[in-house]
């Protein structure tokens, strides 16, 4: 297996313009494909997840052109539901941001479509979304294991009264919200359970509004969506930088700054993960906000005990930042780490112990006490981009760290390690 050893880093300083947000890129691509008119998307993320979405749209007859660096996409919308040219199988890798929204949107058509992916995708639950789509008339079969992909879709979604479980993934609600305006009937979506990652729903609603569709949101417990609508292209749309990707650089600034400035997001950003900066501030770092930047300056870091439900992806970065904080850090209400690219709670606990931390792993929390001195270890990344990037921070100590399968960062940030090296002064 390929590996990358990062030597100790004495200081991190400088600015980075972030690649586009994965969450925003794939939502914008799907809405542009469903919309009337041509959309020019700029600062699109070039990553595995986005390539899977683009390949699927192409197979569904959507025409687009990409710039040489794949960050600009000119896409001609379908002016309504996506239609398969006959029976079709779409392979979506491990891209949850493609699988969930497409599973819903493709229930508006008539043809038979199979959605599948790599082995980990077949372990990521989708039953709650399928249950909701069936309530709206969709005809869906599980081809292997009940409640998991692969799925066979045969259209039939018309809207109506629908319940969705919000406790596992906000992507299920996102998928229903984006699909419902194109259904023939009005849709009322009721959310049961505590809605996880609520800020991701704000991203969805914000983008839908940009494409000309507004819906009634009653305290995130009920959404009323008029049927028979159309999305309309906004013309040009700039994808904001990925706030989850910003977390590694901001954390590096907190631990070993100088000052690190990330551009492409700021106080006006629609991504909930910008709140990560507030957590670093609570831990002792100094944060400066601009409209399109966030800067972080080193501080004396101390442990925190916090509910992280609102920033589940960026919260992983706090788990490795905790290695540099005084005291025991507890991250709570993070059950949905278990249904991501890997079981992130188990993975994080396992790898933190390798570098010497004392870790308590609960059903939905993790408690981390740093060692007096970090140990050099080979870090397993579980084919999870965030594990690789989180554990790069270990090199901000006086100990090297070896990252196994470093190229897994291609899911959201193909040149992550090059960018980190560019801003780092070796010890």
UniProtKB/Swiss-Prot annotation:
Under the heading Pfam families, the entry gives:
EPSP_synthase
- What does the UniProt keyword field contain? Amino-acid biosynthesis, Aromatic amino acid biosynthesis, Cytoplasm, Transferase
Q: In which pathway does it act?
A: Metabolic intermediate biosynthesis; chorismate biosynthesis; chorismate from D-erythrose 4-phosphate and phosphoenolpyruvate: step 6/7
GO terms (molecular function) for this protein are:
3-phosphoshikimate 1-carboxyvinyltransferase activity
Q: Which reaction does it catalyse?
A: 3-phosphoshikimate + phosphoenolpyruvate = 5-O-(1-carboxyvinyl)-3-phosphoshikimate + phosphate
Instruction: Kindly list the positions annotated as binding phosphoenolpyruvate.
Output: 22, 96, 124, 171, 344, 386, 411
Q: Tell whether Transmembrane is among the UniProt keywords.
A: no
Q: Does the keyword Cytoplasm apply?
A: yes
A GO biological process of this protein is: aromatic amino acid family biosynthetic process
Q: Which SUPFAM superfamilies match?
A: EPT/RTPC-like
Q: Which GO terms describe its cellular component?
A: cytoplasm
Catalytic site positions: 313 (proton acceptor)
Q: Which residues bind 3-phosphoshikimate?
A: 22-23, 27, 169-171, 197, 313, 336, 340
Cell location: Cytoplasm
User: Domain of life of the organism in this record?
Assistant: Bacteria
Q: What's the family?
A: Belongs to the EPSP synthase family.
Q: What does this protein do?
A: Catalyzes the transfer of the enolpyruvyl moiety of phosphoenolpyruvate (PEP) to the 5-hydroxyl of shikimate-3-phosphate (S3P) to produce enolpyruvyl shikimate-3-phosphate and inorganic phosphate.
What is the name attached to this protein's record?
A: 3-phosphoshikimate 1-carboxyvinyltransferase
Q: Which gene encodes it?
A: aroA
């Amino acid at each position: 297996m390929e590996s990358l050893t990062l030597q100790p880093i004495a200081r991190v300083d400088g600015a980075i313009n972030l690649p586009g947000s994965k969450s925003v890129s794939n939502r914008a691509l799907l809405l542009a494909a469903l919309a009337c008119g041509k959309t020019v998307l700029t600062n699109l993320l070039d990553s595995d997840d986005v390539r899977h979405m683009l390949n699927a749209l192409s197979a569904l007859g959507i025409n687009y052109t990409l710039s040489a660096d794949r960050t600009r996409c000119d896409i001609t919308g379908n002016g309504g539901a996506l239609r398969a040219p006959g029976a079709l199988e779409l392979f979506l890798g491990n891209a949850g941001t493609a699988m969930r929204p497409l599973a819903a949107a493709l229930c508006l058509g008539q043809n038979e479509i199979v959605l599948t992916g790599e082995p980990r995708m077949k372990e990521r639950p989708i039953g709650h979304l399928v249950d909701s789509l069936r309530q709206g008339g969709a005809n869906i079969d599980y081809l292997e294991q009940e409640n998991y992909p692969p799925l066979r879709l045969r259209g039939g979604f018309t809207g109506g009264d629908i319940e969705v479980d919000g406790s596992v993934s906000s992507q299920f609600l996102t998928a229903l919200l984006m699909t419902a305006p194109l259904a023939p009937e009005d849709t009322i979506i009721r959310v049961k359970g505590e809605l996880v990652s609520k800020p991701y729903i704000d991203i969805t609603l914000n983008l839908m509004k940009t494409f000309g569709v507004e819906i009634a949101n009653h305290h995130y417990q009920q959404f009323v969506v008029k049927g028979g609508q159309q999305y309309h292209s906004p013309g040009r749309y700039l994808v904001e930088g990925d706030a989850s990707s910003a977390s590694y650089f901001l954390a590096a600034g907190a631990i070993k700054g100088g000052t690190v400035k990330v551009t492409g997001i700021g106080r006006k950003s629609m991504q909930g993960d910008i709140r990560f900066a507030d957590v670093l501030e609570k831990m002792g770092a100094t944060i400066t906000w601009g409209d399109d930047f966030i800067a972080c300056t080193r501080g004396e870091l101390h442990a925190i005990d916090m509910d992280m439900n609102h920033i589940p992806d960026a919260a992983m970065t706090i788990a490795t930042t905790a290695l540099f904080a005084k005291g025991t850090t507890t991250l709570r209400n993070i059950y949905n780490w278990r249904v991501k690219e890997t079981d992130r709670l188990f993975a994080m606990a396992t790898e933190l112990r390798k570098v010497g931390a004392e870790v308590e792993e609960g059903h939905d929390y993790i408690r981390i006490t740093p060692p007096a001195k970090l140990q050099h270890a080979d870090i397993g990344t579980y084919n999870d981009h965030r594990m690789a990037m989180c554990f790069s921070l270990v090199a901000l100590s006086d100990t090297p760290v070896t990252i196994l399968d470093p190229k897994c960062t291609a899911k959201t940030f193909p040149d992550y390690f090059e960018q980190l090296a560019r801003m780092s002064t070796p010890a």
